[in-house]
């Protein structure tokens, strides 16, 4: 079976949730899943479920660099080194019998220069034929849009944050 590329993008809620849902579905069908998370420290609630499933490996950077806008130059350099190493590691692992490879927030990591988009594009074009790949994040480049077989855009119409309601554990993270 030919693996396809999914891109979940947009300013709305649900990109990671959709990727988690597909991961659960794939694991339920006996497929091996590699779920890599960028720009997050691995403490999101949905990862607890993924870690409990057979056939699912979760990879993330254990260091928390904070929000990109608040990073100084030294922190950005450290984040770039850590996320680039994570990308190289998970790309290598994905060739070892993985059926579904999720790169959560890889689009944002590219946009902030924390991983090289060219490296990601080269991987997508040279990946194992049967490997299904999911990318998530806001504002994908035209190169990523062109590489994708599915593009799903989540659009925000209204969000509680606009009324001062903070993100809630178990709902938004």
Where are the language model's segments positioned?
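Hydrophobic anchor at the start of a short beta-strand
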Residues: 33, 133, 151
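Conserved P-loop
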Residues: 4-92
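Phosphate-binding/switch loop-helix module in NTP-utilizing enzymes
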Residues: 70-132
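Short, glycine/charged-enriched secondary-structure capping and boundary segments
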Residues: 22, 48-51, 73, 115-119, ...
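Phosphate-binding/switch region of NTP-binding enzymes
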Residues: 139-173
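Conserved nucleotide-binding/hydrolysis micro-motifs of P-loop NTPases
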Residues: 39-42, 64-65, 107-108, 139-142, ...
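Hydrophobic/aromatic ligand-binding patch that stacks against planar heteroaromatic rings
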Residues: 25, 49, 123, 143-144
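Conserved D-loop beta-strand region of ABC ATPase nucleotide-binding domains
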Residues: 136
